[in-house]
């Protein structure tokens, strides 16, 4: 059995210990008030908020999942991640949705609901429903992270993956409970430095392994069966292994995911880092920084995919061995499901004495004396488990010391994403459920303890669902295409349509949320495209129908929202709120923002693609993509950056 060296373990233990110490040191400052605990007192500079935003997208499970698609498809796997991993919604936050939400002065998205719809019993229901759906989404996202962590940790530690994951989750939960948003941002800064350094190291190691693009393409063809592995442009149809056939019509799936996130991006911006920003400029700058920092993730993942190609080629020159190994394990353990396949193989590897000697002997004869190092890559269906490529590369192809640092980097990615997510969900529970419904006059100390309890509860429930998940890809697809799609309409329409009211948001949230949960319970194998279409229609029908069948939001509330947020869209009854030069300035800002969005999307898409083309030494494709990147940068400068700086200069002069 491969295992980490003592130096690697020392690095990992030292990192986790340092994280706990930092959390304890931040406790006093974070506990001075809810504003400090959840938003850092609204005093954190944009570059620290940008690091925190980057960490929310740089998670361990997502990195493993995207690496699996890049392993199967090469750079074209990037286009499948238009469903989430490419962070297309960031373009909308960068240009305008982040600053729209900051202008409210609220602490959470549910609190923002009162700002948008006014003080009423119906608005309170919307606020609580919004908090409930946010907490549910956080729980399922946490389950997704925990499932990925168990796959990762089972490769490195001689204990059941469930227990090692529990230890890591416990450490990160204690840290999040004690340090609040200050600690989230502080560790995100440290972890961001570790992760980016690791990205550069892995990208260089992979680049150095490739003799040339043609040689890589030939090896990839032998390993994956994909004849166009080094291509960067999507195709109408591409071969996919068993279990992933739904992604074969690549252009159709890419287009579908793009439309889904274009719609979803219209309703973004309600994250804590935007509520906590000091100005409109800081909202844009932190988003820009997030995009640049997330870019480093892609050479890391294509690097792992390349090294995985060479690793599988050396370990399994004959793919038939994989099928025979899986069949052998199924024979001795026919009751094992896909959800617990990894736990079974990890147990066989770490405790072979617990299993029949005949099974161990046949595995050794089939896989060779190093059978324990090869078995983790054997998937449930008798093919390479692509979700295990990343930990397999770390275990087999990275030297001691550096291996420990890279494992720490993956821990850091998981901790950063989990900490920010749990902190945000806890804020919703304490502010919008506990204090709002049960203890409106609760003292600060009581509310801080309520945040501790809610953090613990969210983690426990997320851990339970994570253990039961069959696949990180399956769970991620449901979260994005069903659960979140069922909440699209209330989030979008309330920003752009004056007639959208609290009843409409209730209708859209309830119909979409119930639909997503029922779909997962009754039809878990429903295709992602069908999930999205069905839940989106339910959400829009509920929101539009509920709004039109009830009274509109009181005009004074709408006027206050419109005047402070200054949105574009269907706001004709409110346009008279701005007159003359002020009206012209608002229209000019909105027009620039709308034009800037497609340029920002072009910039972001090409920004992530360019470094992957460099790593695989596809220089011709790189120089074809570069002009598109420069067009995006130019458009952003003229339609986003220059107008933003002019407005900031005008505000400074006026004050």
Write out the residue ranges for each language-model feature.
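Membrane-embedded helix-loop-helix hairpins and adjacent transmembrane boundary segments
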Residues: 1-655
